[in-house]
Amino acid sequence: MDLCYVLHADHGMNASTFSSRVTIATLSDVYSAITTAIGTLKGPLHGGANEGVIKMLKEIGSLDKVDAWVADALAQKKKIMGIGHRVYKTLDPRAPHLKRMAQVLSAQLGEPKWIQMSDRIAEIMLREKHLNANVDFYSATVYYSLGIPKIGRAHV
């Protein structure tokens, strides 16, 4: 888990860092800044993207359905969660570390399904769209394998 914390925290000026800095700049307290950062991190296009990845993998269901699912998603111009990055136009340098963690956890748990599906999706997206998996793509399998529950969404 320490590696996950470092990979997510030591990442420059992302959305959650920016939002917390804006809060602090108003001379608010540190608790408000942390709350702001967590609220931003929860968004599905920032830290919450890994929830979208697991949801996608569960929807696909099995390795033999990946190719057809991705082809259909691309034909419908759907966003493939965890693929591509606004800053990293090549490989997200954090992704290989989380990929290795996902592989190790999958092997230890005897549950290779999620990492196999993820690897296949990443391979297809690199070939078809020249987009790499990002940090959220593999952290989804890591966190799911560790039994970390998803963040609940408020119903308004």
Model features per residue range: what roles?
Residues 1-153:
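Non-transmembrane, aqueous-exposed alpha-helical and coiled segments at domain scale
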